[in-house]
Amino acid sequence: RISEQRSNIRALAVDGTSGTLLACDSTGRPQGEALLYSEACQGFELQLQKLVPEGGPASSNSGSLARALQLTKVYGPSTLLRHQADWINGWFLGDWTWGEEGNNLRLGWNLENHSWPEALTKQPWLNRLPIIKPSGSTLGTIARARALELGLPDDVQIVAGTTDSNAAVL
């Protein structure tokens, strides 16, 4: 019965707590423990002021941007920075390129301009951030090996989900 249900799956979307951030290499291998959404990273106040507008979701020590600065400090500027839902999407795809807009607000993504803040675009680690896609966008087809491992059709589409709070409203 479960295999029959799995064979009917056509698309998957992940929702997750938007602030949890992890560092991984280009193959998606985590470099260490994720920094949870509730963890504040102290000592980055001046950098945050230079990178993002004050009062925005990325401007505090408890935002993902502060966690990104901490992870970059520990693991270096060549590590990928991914929120948990974006990392899981990468695991399904075998490709850690993509990020979903809502999950990246606290990292500095601007929903109105559909871009990173200008000061952030000048950082040497900008290319370590995900390419952002809107919620509901198709990111790609599940990796063949992952489909086999999970007993899913090999044409399942992986779709950008949303944050846990947005999903709760839906």
Label every PLM stretch briefly.
Residues 1-8, 45-51, 58:
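N-terminal phosphate-binding loop and adjacent alpha-helix
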Residues 28-41, 104-108:
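A charged helix-plus-loop insertion that forms the helical arch/lid used to bind
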Residues 12, 39, 71:
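Residue-level signal for inorganic ion chemistry
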Residues 53-165:
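Gly/Ser/Thr-rich active-site cleft segment
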Residues 35-53:
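Short alpha-helix plus adjacent loop in nuclease-associated cores
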Residues 168-170:
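Thiamine diphosphate
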Residues 1-32, 77-79, 126, 147-160:
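N-terminal glycine/serine-rich phosphate-binding loop of ATP-dependent small-molecule kinases
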